[in-house]
Amino acid sequence: MIKEYREKYNSEFSEETYEKFIKYLDGLCGHKIEFRIAETPIFLPDHLLTEIISASDELTSAISTKEFHDFTRNAIPPGLETPNEEPHPSLLSIDFAICKGEDGKLHPQLIELQGFASLYCYQELLNEAMRKFFFIPERGKSYFYVKDHEEYVEEVRKAIVGDTDPENVILMDIEPEKQKTYIDFLATEKYIGVKPVCITEVIKRGRKLFYKRDGKEIPIERIYNRVINDELERRKDVKYNFSFQDDLDVKWIAHPNWFYRLSKYSMPFYKSKYVPETRFLSDFEKFPDDLENYVLKPLFSFAGVGVMFDIDRKVLESIKDRENYILQKKVVYEPIIETPDIPAKAEIRLLYAWDDKPLLLNNLVRLSKGKMMGVDFNKNQSWVGSSIAYHNRTF
């Protein structure tokens, strides 16, 4: 999107270099990455970066209010509340589509917020590999309010480990080695010393949790939680020894209640030019006539499961539990990233840590040429997948 950078990058790109880049990235943690990595980063022009920062500032201010807490009081499904909720999420992701406005300029539109973990450590691996193999401008940086690798890793460490011994912190997921995000788990261990542990290996004694290392029980003081709630609900074969509803003597990073509060449930709360019109399906007395301009989303699903783009009145009228769906104005991604064939669309995720205030650290990008982001909509495509954005600003 910065023309001179794009032209230079594309002219210097080669498939041979890309293959070396992938091999190097796989080798950094000794693990073959299972999701597609795009052939290119994106280069954010300053005017677009200004709008992205402005939009994210609006949103972080909104979720800090009492009104937001009141609005999302019922976001957590009955029986799934975790005790000892904190007043804000310790980790936060904000996803924006890059769109073109009526003024012909690029603008961000909110896709979703998540009070949940993301690929904080993998993105630093990707940044390192991108810089080694491809043209990245000397001024180009992926960080925001940190200046370099050391400061970035330290802020991630503070958010996840804090003052705790890393041995007493676990990254918890369901069969972590089988997750597509396992590369991030390995990168987390590489950078901050926190090891992945399967939820089935956690031991409960009273209010305390433990895991075993070399035959010895190690107390758990912090859980860097990577368990996706709806995956856990589906996996009836997974037996574990505690409940998320237990009053436990641990600190959650991030607290599980924020998975629900900062989800599609909160979208109708935000009133901003950066947020597409969104309402609970149950709030409609009469459905819009132009349903082709709307998308239907279930509240409690992950990774695009259940999202319907082509809807009609009959579909909406057949839904009984309308309070569990939102109807949202479609966001039109602008195919703006020049590639060797057709332009790609971009979605940028801002990665925050939140102690006393939200701190914007890094970003993650997804590129697509399909109807939606994600592998199922980009089969047999190149220059799509996981990526990163660079900008020229010093914060």
Describe these PLM feature segments:
Residues M1-F395:
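Preference for protein termini
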